[in-house]
């Protein structure tokens, strides 16, 4: 039943029936842990891989001994970096040792290897002053993958792919004649026996003896025209290096370097782990029948007798003895299973080796050699340490290849299984740490080449490590990654939820991933292994659907990069649900039968029913209690954070829930945040983990609180912790970041207590919108097609008012003609325009500005003209003052207005770092309060979005029997066809809760049910159907039917009409076609396209059509003359020749066609090449402001689009071709 729950400082009444087992992990630990691993281990791995660098003679030896990030010499703090457009980074210092083997001389030096970007506590990076997020990438895991197809005769054809982390691929395939082929590194196919011969089994007899008798193998041998190892080697060499003279030696070294050289072929830990999982012998012989006695080679003891079934434990024992070949019986045939000879080291070594940190299987022959030659614990450990790369090879080894061939043969006997590449056991996550590591590796290997070259050139006596190392390639590759990788994105900072979701995003795109065009339907689809790992709901609509996902709430990423989800263990003896929590990967989960989290159990954990609903792989079954092995931990473990914030999600259609999840990320922070009356209980966790709220670092007592600082006296040592609050800062998206204290003086705070609210949070809970009194009622057609009718009260009381801050910058550069100057002294500008400009030429803080107002006065020197004698005389007398300058001041762009809230000035003199050629940089911040207005887009949390169609006076809105007018009217027709019934339940519950004064938590899949809502309505004194009589505000008459009325949580989205509305009379024109530009950013016109021309033609509106195609567009002289005529009040002149006609003529001439324009008398009409002389006579500039909008604006625009789901760089729209309407993409094209 309903019970109170404390979340932060607020009590919510919860309808949850299940008690939560286990904590939700920190929501941004994906980012933090990964970067942490990189600094601790990842960097070291790269140095280990590249050590030592030797010159070509092998005499000089360069080694990286150790490294440290110098955290004490970080230049600027995070806030300063944002202000100064610099990168938040620490210098990486590496200790390098150079050994000269001839002289035995050793030189050690500490070498600076560039500034390394650091992750902030919030999991972001500050790169050039912009906050960026590195998105985790979902890629195919390295390993062996088998597939099966059925050909037209109905026979099964098996194929396989061996995928390394980097290096040559091996692909096996069977044709319909039962011949198995191999492709090495995507070349032409060869019979597989050629590969086996080249690796060491040269003759037919050796192959058959090793792999066993098999039809397909024999067919392949017949097809194979080589008979010895040498022939096979030469054949492979011819295929891989066509045109080079083949020799056996070069062929051998080619194969060695292709597969068995750790520098060229890398499986990585994950690959080795997946190989052993797939090829280890114990997994393949379990539950098979032995065809011969299996004998322990050390003791001679018979482990399994012929004809006996091999169970799991026996199989593991067989593997641990070092047995790698087992004959098993399949339908009266004997088949030989060959493993890859890897064993679990812990079963063979009697002492504790946990300090060696070996988690994978190890190669048995090497281990046996060590155990045979050494007896005592210390020396065995020492040898294992020395031979770790032989025990756990990073590259593929011959045994692996034999085992993969054997697996391919075994599949036709139904031993083994085929793989599903969309299964999350076969896809892994590359998080920040690994992406950085790969990038760093690229940089280091480039550097290695430079070092080797320098070693040969420089004098070996005086050489030092510092002189050898060039850090350029390393620094450049890191910089390139953060600045321009598809996975390094401009953080979506619209509100705390969008920040959090961005950090938890999983993308299948990017380098080494899929591309949008190639990704088929299967990759994008929801898969049963996504359960509890990836959200099935939250993904963008549009071309990226299913390629960009979100991590589920309880998911974690393990050391191999596989996503894990937690389950409760069921005690196998008495079948009781314990509180033991086990994190499992998708592979492990497939082995078990798992019950739902809301399966009824009593307080001791025993199941109430005899039969239980369970999941087993992709099936949902009902099984007896005795078969259940695990149980879900929480009903919301399968969805992401944004989706878990939708109340009554279980009553919404999936596609609408998807829109709801995506639109919450676009909610603009409002002036006064308000937590939802009907929440789901995850709001507090989401806000605290998003990193926008300051938390107490230590327990203590608050001693001072003001709007911008909080001080806490620590309990431990009586010292003072100071917390500076952010006031009215601009976010990446131009929304406002403002923190307000929520603790008071004298309050005792524990560690991690929230001290202040941030944007869109209320008492530490995420508060994206407002609770609004609404009714489902149509009103005079103003609700047509999802439009919304709102009351003027929302405007008057600033309910949906938000603050937006824009940044503009002006820089004074050195030009060829002299330096630009920031000054108040601007030519041809009256005193009126300068009233808010101070003596430096910069606007004062607090000034109110409109579009066209000067923000920063700036003049640029004009070109010197040849001076006449008189002018030279004047110059000589009066000095330089008469020098020509033109006005290039920074002005407020069209359609913008507001109040100056901050001005920042950077100059060379103050020692600020400025780009080359810039002497002074001024930034102005303009804040505007945007009230809700017609054309703004609003939405609920259930995908019910609409645009405001009319603001109605309060007195005209429909009102309740107690006289309260509604605040919003929504169309009832928006509900049934869309099947998002959750909104109706939310409205009913909101009505009851507001009357009872409750805040409610109704968790997803475990929330209030219909009977609960009815009880609440009854308790609040409303009728059970939640409907009430409404009266018309204009007449006072009641409406015919009773109406559903209640409180709904409504968000104002970032698609604001002020940013979209746009008008132009004259403005900039395109250079070649002379047509007006398109789009608001270019201050363009509306395109009058082909179809619109047809419409005017159909009307026969000849004159209108003529002027649209000429003077309103690209008749250069005509448009100036027309403008002049309008100004002077004369008649409009005849249109001239449109520029596009001249372009057409030129294009035809470019095709070598002699095209001329003739008049009636066949006289050629000369089209003027240039219209400049005409235009000059007219002395009218109709391009409005001569200069086009500042580049700054365009940069902003690019930035805001950058996070837009990894747009590929090359999809630049041709702005001239698009109309404004096209630019204003579909509401949710991607996730704008």
UniProtKB/Swiss-Prot annotation:
InterPro entries: DNA-dir_RNA_pol_bsu_ext_1_sf, DNA-dir_RNA_pol_bsu_external_1, DNA-dir_RNA_pol_su2, DNA-dir_RNAP_su2_dom, DNA-dir_RNAP_su2_hyb_sf, RNA_pol_bsu_bac, RNA_pol_bsu_CS, RNA_pol_bsu_protrusion. GO terms for molecular function: DNA binding; DNA-directed RNA polymerase activity; ribonucleoside binding. Residues 1171-1180, 1199-1232 have a biased composition (Acidic residues). It is an enzyme of class 2 (transferase). GO terms for biological process: DNA-templated transcription. GO terms for cellular component: DNA-directed RNA polymerase complex. Residues 1170-1232 are annotated as: Disordered. Gene3D superfamilies: 2.40.50.100, 2.40.50.150, 3.90.1100.10, DNA-directed RNA polymerase, beta subunit, external 1 domain (2.30.150.10), DNA-directed RNA polymerase, subunit 2, domain 6 (2.40.270.10), RNA polymerase alpha subunit dimerisation domain (3.90.1800.10), RNA polymerase Rpb2, domain 2 (3.90.1110.10). It catalyses: RNA(n) + a ribonucleoside 5'-triphosphate = RNA(n+1) + diphosphate. Keywords: DNA-directed RNA polymerase, Nucleotidyltransferase, Transcription, Transferase. The keyword Transferase applies. Disulfide bonds: none annotated. It comes from the Bacteria. Residues 1189-1198 have a biased composition (Basic and acidic residues). Pfam families: RNA_pol_Rpb2_1, RNA_pol_Rpb2_2, RNA_pol_Rpb2_3, RNA_pol_Rpb2_45, RNA_pol_Rpb2_6, RNA_pol_Rpb2_7. Its EC number is 2.7.7.6. Belongs to the RNA polymerase beta chain family. The RNAP catalytic core consists of 2 alpha, 1 beta, 1 beta' and 1 omega subunit. When a sigma factor is associated with the core the holoenzyme is formed, which can initiate transcription. DNA-dependent RNA polymerase catalyzes the transcription of DNA into RNA using the four ribonucleoside triphosphates as substrates. HAMAP family: RNApol_bact_RpoB. This is DNA-directed RNA polymerase subunit beta. It comes from Clostridium botulinum (strain Okra / Type B1). The lineage of its organism: Bacteria, Bacillati, Bacillota, Clostridia, Eubacteriales. The gene is rpoB.
């Amino acid at each position: 039943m309903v019970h109170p729950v404390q979340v932060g400082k607020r009590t919510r009444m919860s309808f949850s029936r299940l008690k939560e087992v286990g904590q939700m992990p920190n929501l941004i630990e994906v980012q933090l842990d990964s970067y942490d691993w990189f600094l601790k281990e990842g960097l070291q791995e790269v140095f280990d891989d590249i050590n030592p660098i030797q010159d070509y003679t092998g005499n000089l030896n360069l080694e990286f001994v150790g490294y440290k990030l110098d955290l004490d010499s970080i230049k600027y703090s995070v806030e300063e970096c944002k202000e100064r457009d610099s990168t938040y980074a620490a210098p990486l210092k590496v200790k390098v040792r150079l050994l000269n083997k001839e002289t035995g001389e050793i030189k050690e030096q500490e070498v600076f290897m560039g500034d390394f970007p650091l992750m902030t506590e919030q999991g972001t990076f500050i790169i050039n002053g912009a906050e960026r997020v590195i998105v985790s990438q979902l890629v195919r895991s390295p390993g062996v993958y088998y597939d099966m197809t059925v050909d037209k005769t109905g026979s099964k054809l098996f194929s396989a792919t061996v995928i390394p982390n980097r290096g040559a691929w091996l692909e096996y395939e069977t044709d319909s004649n039962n011949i198995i082929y191999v492709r090495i590194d995507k070349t032409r196919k060869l019979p597989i026996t050629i590969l086996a011969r080249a690796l060491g089994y040269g003759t037919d007899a050796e192959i058959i003896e090793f792999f066993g008798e098999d039809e397909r193998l024999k067919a392949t041998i017949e097809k194979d025209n080589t008979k010895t190892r040498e022939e096979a080697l030469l054949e492979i060499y011819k295929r891989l290096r066509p045109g080079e003279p083949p020799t056996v030696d070069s062929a051998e070294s080619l194969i060695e370097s292709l597969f068995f050289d750790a520098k060229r072929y890398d499986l990585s830990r994950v690959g080795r782990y997946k190989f052993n999982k797939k090829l280890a012998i114990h997994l393949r012989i379990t539950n098979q029948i032995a065809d011969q006695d299996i004998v322990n080679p050390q003791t001679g003891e018979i482990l399994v007798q012929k004809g006996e079934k091999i169970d799991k434990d026996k199989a593991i024992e067989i593997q641990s003895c070092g047995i790698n070949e087992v004959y098993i019986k399949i339908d009266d045939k004997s088949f030989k299973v060959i493993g890859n000879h890897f064993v679990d080291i812990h079963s063979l070594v009697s002492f504790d080796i946990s300090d060696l940190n070996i988690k994978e299987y190890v190669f048995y022959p090497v281990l046996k050699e060590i155990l045979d030659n050494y007896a005592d614990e210390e020396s065995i450990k020492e040898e294992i340490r020395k031979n770790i790369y032989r025990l756990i090879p990073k590259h593929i080894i011959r045994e692996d290849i034999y085992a993969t061939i054997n697996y391919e043969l075994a599949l036709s006997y139904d031993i083994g299984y085929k793989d599903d590449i969309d299964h999350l056991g076969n896809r892994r996550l590359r998080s920040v740490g690994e992406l950085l590591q790969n990038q760093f590796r690229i940089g280091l290997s480039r550097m290695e080449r430079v070092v080797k070259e320098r070693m040969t050139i420089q004098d070996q006596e005086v050489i030092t490590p510092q002189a050898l190392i060039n850090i350029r390639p390393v620094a450049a590759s890191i910089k390139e990654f953060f600045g321009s990788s598809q996975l390094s994105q401009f953080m979506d900072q619209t509100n705390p939820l969008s920040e959090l979701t961005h950090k938890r995003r999983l993308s299948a795109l990017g380098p080494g991933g899929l591309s949008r065009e190639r990704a088929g339907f299967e990759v994008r689809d929801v898969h049963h292994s996504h359960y509890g790992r990836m959200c099935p709901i939250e993904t963008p609509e549009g071309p990226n659907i299913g390629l960009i996902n979100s991590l589920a709430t309880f998911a974690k990423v393990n050391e191999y990069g596989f996503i894990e989800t937690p389950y409760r263990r069921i005690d196998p003896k008495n079948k009781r649900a314990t509180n033991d929590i086990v994190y499992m990967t998708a592979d492990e989960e497939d082995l078990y039968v798992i019950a739902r989290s809301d399966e009824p159990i009593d307080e001791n954990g025993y199941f109430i029913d005899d039969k239980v609903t369970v999941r087993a792989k992709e099936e949902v079954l009902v099984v007896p209690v005795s078969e259940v092995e695990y149980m879900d931990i929480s009903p919301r473990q399968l969805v992401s954070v944004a989706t878990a914030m939708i109340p009554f999600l279980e009553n919404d259609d999936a596609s609408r829930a998807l829109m709801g999840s995506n639109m919450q990320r676009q909610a603009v922070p409002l002036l006064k945040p308000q937590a939802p009356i009907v929440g789901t209980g995850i709001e507090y966790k989401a806000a605290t983990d998003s990193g926008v709220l300051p938390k107490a670092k230590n327990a203590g007592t608050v001693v001072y609180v003001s709007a911008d600082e909080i001080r806490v006296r620590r309990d431990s040592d009586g010292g003072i912790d100071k917390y500076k609050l952010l006031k009215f800062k601009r976010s990446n998206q131009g929304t406002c970041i403002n923190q307000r204290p929520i603790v008071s003086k004298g309050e005792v705070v524990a560690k991690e207590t929230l001290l202040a609210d941030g944007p869109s949070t209320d008492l530490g809970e995420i508060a994206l919108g407002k609770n609004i009194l609404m009714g489902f009622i149509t009103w005079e057609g103003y609700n047509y097609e999802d439009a919304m009718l709102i009351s003027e009260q929302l405007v008057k009381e600033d309910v949906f008012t938000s603050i937006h801050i824009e940044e503009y910058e002006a820089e004074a550069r050195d030009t060829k003609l002299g330096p630009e100057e920031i000054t108040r002294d601007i030519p041809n500008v009256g005193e009126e325009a300068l009233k808010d400009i101070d003596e430096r030429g910069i606007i004062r803080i607090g000034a109110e500005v409109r579009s066209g107002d000067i923000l920063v006065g700036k003049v640029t020197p004009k070109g010197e003209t040849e001076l006449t004698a008189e002018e030279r005389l004047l110059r000589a007398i009066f000095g330089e003052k008469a020098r020509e300058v033109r006005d290039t001041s920074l002005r407020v762009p069209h359609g913008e207005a507001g109040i100056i809230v901050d001005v920042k000035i950077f100059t060379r003199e103050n020692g600020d770092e400025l780009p080359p050629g810039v002497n002074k940089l001024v930034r102005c911040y303009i804040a505007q309060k945007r009230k809700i207005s017609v054309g703004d887009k609003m939405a609920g949390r259930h995908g019910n979005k609409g645009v405001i169609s009319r603001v109605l006076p309060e007195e005209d809105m429909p009102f309740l029997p107690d006289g309260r007018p509604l605040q919003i009217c929504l169309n009832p027709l928006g509900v049934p066809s869309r099947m998002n019934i959750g909104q109706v339940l939310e409205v009913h519950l909101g009505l009851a809760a507001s009357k009872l004064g409750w805040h409610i938590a109704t968790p997803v899949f475990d929330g209030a049910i219909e009977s609960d809502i009815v009880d609440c309505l009854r308790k609040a004194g409303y009728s059970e159907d939640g409907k009430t009589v409404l009266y018309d505000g204009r007449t006072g008459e009641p409406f015919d039917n009773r109406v559903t009325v209640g409180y709904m949580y409504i968000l104002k989205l970032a698609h604001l009409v002020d940013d979209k509305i746009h008008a132009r009379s004259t403005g900039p024109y395109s250079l070649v076609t002379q047509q007006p530009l398109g789009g608001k950013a270019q201050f363009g016109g509306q395109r009058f396209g082909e179809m619109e021309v047809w419409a005017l033609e159909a009307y026969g509106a000849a004159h209108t059509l003529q002027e649209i195609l000429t003077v309103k567009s690209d008749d250069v002289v005509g448009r100036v003359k027309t403008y002049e005529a309008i100004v002077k009040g004369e008649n409009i002149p005849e249109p001239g020749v449109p520029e596009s006609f001249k372009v057409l003529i030129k294009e035809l001439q470019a095709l070598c066609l002699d095209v001329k324009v003739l008049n009636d008398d066949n006289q050629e009409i000369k089209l003027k090449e240039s219209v400049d002389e005409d235009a000059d006579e007219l002395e009218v500039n109709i391009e409005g402001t001569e200069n086009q909008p500042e580049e700054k604006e365009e940069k902003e625009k690019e930035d805001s689009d950058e996070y837009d789901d990894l747009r590929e760089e090359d999809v630049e729209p041709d702005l001239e071709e698009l109309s404004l309407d096209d630019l204003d993409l579909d509401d949710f094209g991607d996730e704008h």
